[in-house]
Amino acid sequence: MEKVIANELINFLYESPTAFHAVKNVKDTLEFEGFKELKEADRWNLEVQGKYFVTKNDSALIAFRVGKGDIAENGFKIIGAHTDSPGFRIKPNPEITVENTYVKLNTEVYGGPILNTWFDRPLALAGRVSLVSKNPLKPVNKIVNINRPILIIPNLAIHMNREVNEGYKINRQKDTLPLLSLVNETLEKGNYLVELLAKELYCEKEDILDFELYPYEYEKGCLMGLNEEFISSGRLDDLSMVHAGIKALMDAEVSQATNVMVCFDNEEVGSATKQGGDSDFLKTILERIVLALGKDREDFLRSLSESFMISADLAHAVHPNLGEKHDPVVRPVLGKGPVIKIAASQSYTSDSDSSAVYEMICRNAGVNVQKFVNRSDMRGGSTIGPISSTHLPIRSVDMGTPILAMHSIREFGAVKDHFDCIKSFTEFFRI
């Protein structure tokens, strides 16, 4: 069963090259399971034990199941994750011709990818394209996935870059521009990409107004290791937590509390967008749920005091070759269960109270749990947990499954950890 779930995850990752595609795939899955889509512009009429979801910007989503109990007294049980991953974004008017022969695309870095992992790999291209419409305030938005190996970022030969293995510094503007094609007389000069998009979308190139396009690794993820105990794939951070949370939401029985799965966008660039964790998106939706159930704002505020959030973003496992980069005592590893993330700086929301909650959940689910802290002389990252807490004053724990090579084009985790994470999430939604 563990490998079945792992292969489901790999398929989801492959079919979700961008946040737009991840939300579309989650949306399709939820609708198949009987969840009803709500529009922010509509008035909501919700039913007890009803199943619903709402999207934002095509790249963020909140799904929920209304609980059996009084929402003011039972509150919300929330799992939060994010849909975006670090990489590159194509700039406007991106075509650059070199030596009157090569056509490459101008890019900017999105988030904090490990740049050298993107070299010499066949890359595909996906994202969202905005087309002209009759209403200027509402362009037609279409997602596109050019699932072909059309791009590559070639390395410079070692004969011309002798220091490449000695810590060569990669220039983000010069060194990371992907090669698209050779100059072709049949394509309109300077509009190679627009021509390609028009063909993919079966539209006129004049109708294309703008786009958000991201290169991604063409090769699909896989199970690997002597016993296929590992998962190797791009975008484990953080779509594996999206997959785990959505599956738990669908599988868990209806509880007294209202179960919520929130998938934010733009975590990798600070979350400060309308669809990110540093917005009122989640707070607004939670309040609307309470109001749509016939309660008032006082009941909403009461519900928050009875709520709990699991901020699910991946954790660093001890590296087999560089174990000294971790704390000398607290050392999470692959295959030994999900990880509670702790920081005195409050870059994670976990405290003794919230950590104990998740530990008891894991104990009830029969799941081993680990802990992570940074070395005291190394600064770590943060995630949506502390950002969301500034908008929603509810108890929260930061956790995630352990992986290696975080922010590489191809990350590396354990089959068992993902399975155990789903078990813990299902138990959380059940209680």
Name each region found by the language model.
Residues 1-431:
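N-terminal hydrophobic/helix-forming segments and targeting peptides
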